[in-house]
Amino acid sequence: MIEKSQACHDSLLDSVGQTPMVQLHQLFPKHEVFAKLEYMNPGGSMKDRPAKYIIEHGIKHGLITENTHLIESTSGNLGIALAMIAKIKGLKLTCVVDPKISPTNLKIIKSYGVNVEMVEEPDAHGGYLMTRIAKVQELLATIEDAYWINQYANELNWQSHYHGAGTEIVETIKQPIDYFVAPVSTTGSIMGMSRKIKEVHPNVQIVAVDAKGSVIFGDKPINRELPGIGASRVPEILNRSEINQVIHVDDYQSALGCRKLIDYEGIFAGGSTGSIIVAIEQLITSIEEGATIVTILPDRGDRYLDLVYSDTWLEKMKSRQGVKSE
């Protein structure tokens, strides 16, 4: 038997987590802004954490067996994470997606050989989430040994981030954390990480970054194009009282934020990261200079080449927001 060093993992799943943190000196020179690079997980996003945590918990407790057929509604990243882990574990998986999934994400999911169900009809809010959930319910009623991941209501979702990135953040940042800024969709990441951070930094302010037109915090629903941030339903795992501030960012602003991050820091990240950059820019106009801000960069930019990094898409979003061309 070949002896392996501690740096050699037995499985790709062992490389989930322990993502690096970087300080964004160029973008925010008057504040200490630390970003956790969650896009450096093996599946390319922070969704590797709940996918691994939920599946391994299910296997441990006998809820998931070799005959189980996993089912989940996803805008892309969780689907990729589940597909990766299902392939490693030898499990069947069906991902329910909609037309707003990025073409790259859809290709990646299909490359793993899992089943893909594409819904076509938008829901009452103009999105597809409720339509996807209806399709999930239909599949649960017809597929034998089906197991729904159910990320919007599954307490294991936020727990994965509490024990994962949340713990890693408090182990890395030793100075007091004044603000934790995170995007929301299922709200699992902001709930889990903030709860862990508050245990060590009780005075931290929790700032949620939501999409304009998302209903999570009561905004009026409008058509949204950017996947991975916002929702057309309020997640069951959200506790609104734990959020101190909400900043809404539209699709056009998000794209500009992504491009600015590349220009200043050389970081090529996904759409919700652009929303985070815009939100932090707004936040620092009203807080003390030198404050410590911690955030997360959820996924990779190469999954959005047809969206936020497309000049055609950018012009479309610019026109939709009524921004006049210079």
From Swiss-Prot:
A Gene Ontology BP annotation from the UniProt entry: cysteine biosynthetic process from serine
Induction description: Up-regulated under iron-deficient growth conditions. Repressed by Fur under iron-rich growth conditions.
Binding positions for pyridoxal 5'-phosphate per the UniProt entry: 77, 185-189, 272
Top EC class, one word: transferase
Pathway(s): Siderophore biosynthesis
Function: Catalyzes the synthesis of N-((2S)-2-amino-2-carboxyethyl)-L-glutamate (ACEGA) from O-phospho-L-serine and L-glutamate.
Listed name of the protein: N-(2-amino-2-carboxyethyl)-L-glutamate synthase
Cofactor or coenzyme needed: pyridoxal 5'-phosphate
Naturally occurring in which organism (per UniProt): Staphylococcus aureus (strain bovine RF122 / ET3-1)
Catalytic activity: O-phospho-L-serine + L-glutamate = N-[(2S)-2-amino-2-carboxyethyl]-L-glutamate + phosphate + H(+)
UniProt-listed Pfam families: PALP
EC number from the UniProt entry: 2.5.1.140
PANTHER family from the UniProt entry: CYSTATHIONINE BETA-SYNTHASE (PTHR10314)
Quaternary data: Homodimer.
Bilayer-spanning residue ranges: none
Disulfide bridge partners, by residue number: none
Signal sequence segment: none
MF term (GO), any: transferase activity, transferring alkyl or aryl (other than methyl) groups
Modified residues (N6-(pyridoxal phosphate)lysine): 47
UniProt-listed InterPro entries: Cys_Synth/Cystath_Beta-Synth (IPR050214), P-phosphate_BS (IPR001216), SbnA (IPR023927), TrpB-like_PALP (IPR001926), TrpB-like_PALP_sf (IPR036052)
UniProtKB keywords: Pyridoxal phosphate, Transferase
